[in-house]
Amino acid sequence: MVQAVAVLKGDAGVSGVVKFEQASESEPTTVSYEIAGNSPNAERGFHIHEFGDATNGCVSAGPHFNPFKKTHGAPTDEVRHVGDMGNVKTDENGVAKGSFKDSLIKLIGPTSVVGRSVVIHAGQDDLGKGDTEESLKTGNAGPRPACGVIGLTN
């Protein structure tokens, strides 16, 4: 069993923890999250980005992690980035909490997400269904109020 965590921090009052757990390379990864400081009753884009770099804030995390060179999509779409985790939904207090399993996100093997960044966005991800070229790259999810590097835990 491999476990990893990303502690999300930023300059907009958004913070949280995202945990990852994978039993073997062929098994799906369980992702659980609790993120506070968002707008209440909203959906916010939630992605794994290519770089584990926060030297210039969350913008240094680069684009979505996309080792297979696909276009952006929903987590349930066949064509999507590995880093496309869709949207998180906040409650009346601006807290998003939940978990899901994902077969493309790996902690083990050549497409491991360890050392990359989790980013929570300021806007809703259109899941690649928008009518702009940017939709197929980013989902038009907007600015990056918080991020954190995915690191192994014991």
From Swiss-Prot:
<dbReference type="GO" id="GO:0005758">
    <property type="term" value="C:mitochondrial intermembrane space"/>
</dbReference>
<dbReference type="GO" id="GO:0005739">
    <property type="term" value="C:mitochondrion"/>
</dbReference>
<keyword id="KW-0186">Copper</keyword>
<comment type="function">
    <text>Destroys radicals which are normally produced within the cells and which are toxic to biological systems.</text>
</comment>
<dbReference type="GO" id="GO:0004784">
    <property type="term" value="F:superoxide dismutase activity"/>
</dbReference>
<dbReference type="GO" id="GO:0034599">
    <property type="term" value="P:cellular response to oxidative stress"/>
</dbReference>
<keyword id="KW-0862">Zinc</keyword>
<keyword id="KW-0049">Antioxidant</keyword>
<feature type="disulfide bond">
    <location>
        <begin position="58"/>
        <end position="147"/>
    </location>
</feature>
<keyword id="KW-0496">Mitochondrion</keyword>
<feature type="binding site">
    <location>
        <position position="64"/>
    </location>
    <ligand>
        <name>Cu cation</name>
    </ligand>
</feature>
<dbReference type="GO" id="GO:0050821">
    <property type="term" value="P:protein stabilization"/>
</dbReference>
<feature type="binding site" description="in apo form">
    <location>
        <position position="43"/>
    </location>
    <ligand>
        <name>Zn(2+) 2</name>
    </ligand>
</feature>
<feature type="binding site">
    <location>
        <position position="121"/>
    </location>
    <ligand>
        <name>Cu cation</name>
    </ligand>
</feature>
<keyword id="KW-0963">Cytoplasm</keyword>
<feature type="binding site">
    <location>
        <position position="72"/>
    </location>
    <ligand>
        <name>Zn(2+) 1</name>
    </ligand>
</feature>
<feature type="modified residue" description="Phosphothreonine">
    <location>
        <position position="132"/>
    </location>
</feature>
<keyword id="KW-1015">Disulfide bond</keyword>
<dbReference type="Pfam" id="PF00080">
    <property type="entry name" value="Sod_Cu"/>
</dbReference>
<feature type="modified residue" description="Phosphoserine">
    <location>
        <position position="117"/>
    </location>
</feature>
<feature type="binding site">
    <location>
        <position position="49"/>
    </location>
    <ligand>
        <name>Cu cation</name>
    </ligand>
</feature>
<comment type="subunit">
    <text>Homodimer in holo form. In apo form, heterodimer with CCS1. Zinc-binding at 'His-16' of CCS1 and Glu-43 of apo-SOD1 is required for this heterodimerization.</text>
</comment>
<dbReference type="GO" id="GO:0006882">
    <property type="term" value="P:intracellular zinc ion homeostasis"/>
</dbReference>
<dbReference type="GO" id="GO:1990748">
    <property type="term" value="P:cellular detoxification"/>
</dbReference>
<dbReference type="GO" id="GO:0006825">
    <property type="term" value="P:copper ion transport"/>
</dbReference>
<feature type="binding site">
    <location>
        <position position="144"/>
    </location>
    <ligand>
        <name>substrate</name>
    </ligand>
</feature>
<feature type="modified residue" description="Phosphoserine">
    <location>
        <position position="99"/>
    </location>
</feature>
<keyword id="KW-0597">Phosphoprotein</keyword>
<protein>
    <recommendedName>
        <fullName>Superoxide dismutase [Cu-Zn]</fullName>
        <ecNumber>1.15.1.1</ecNumber>
    </recommendedName>
</protein>
<dbReference type="GO" id="GO:0045944">
    <property type="term" value="P:positive regulation of transcription by RNA polymerase II"/>
</dbReference>
<keyword id="KW-0479">Metal-binding</keyword>
<feature type="cross-link" description="Glycyl lysine isopeptide (Lys-Gly) (interchain with G-Cter in SUMO)">
    <location>
        <position position="70"/>
    </location>
</feature>
<feature type="binding site">
    <location>
        <position position="84"/>
    </location>
    <ligand>
        <name>Zn(2+) 1</name>
    </ligand>
</feature>
<dbReference type="GO" id="GO:0005634">
    <property type="term" value="C:nucleus"/>
</dbReference>
<feature type="binding site">
    <location>
        <position position="81"/>
    </location>
    <ligand>
        <name>Zn(2+) 1</name>
    </ligand>
</feature>
<dbReference type="GO" id="GO:0006801">
    <property type="term" value="P:superoxide metabolic process"/>
</dbReference>
<comment type="similarity">
    <text>Belongs to the Cu-Zn superoxide dismutase family.</text>
</comment>
<dbReference type="InterPro" id="IPR001424">
    <property type="entry name" value="SOD_Cu_Zn_dom"/>
</dbReference>
<keyword id="KW-0560">Oxidoreductase</keyword>
<keyword id="KW-0832">Ubl conjugation</keyword>
<dbReference type="InterPro" id="IPR036423">
    <property type="entry name" value="SOD-like_Cu/Zn_dom_sf"/>
</dbReference>
<dbReference type="GO" id="GO:1902693">
    <property type="term" value="C:superoxide dismutase complex"/>
</dbReference>
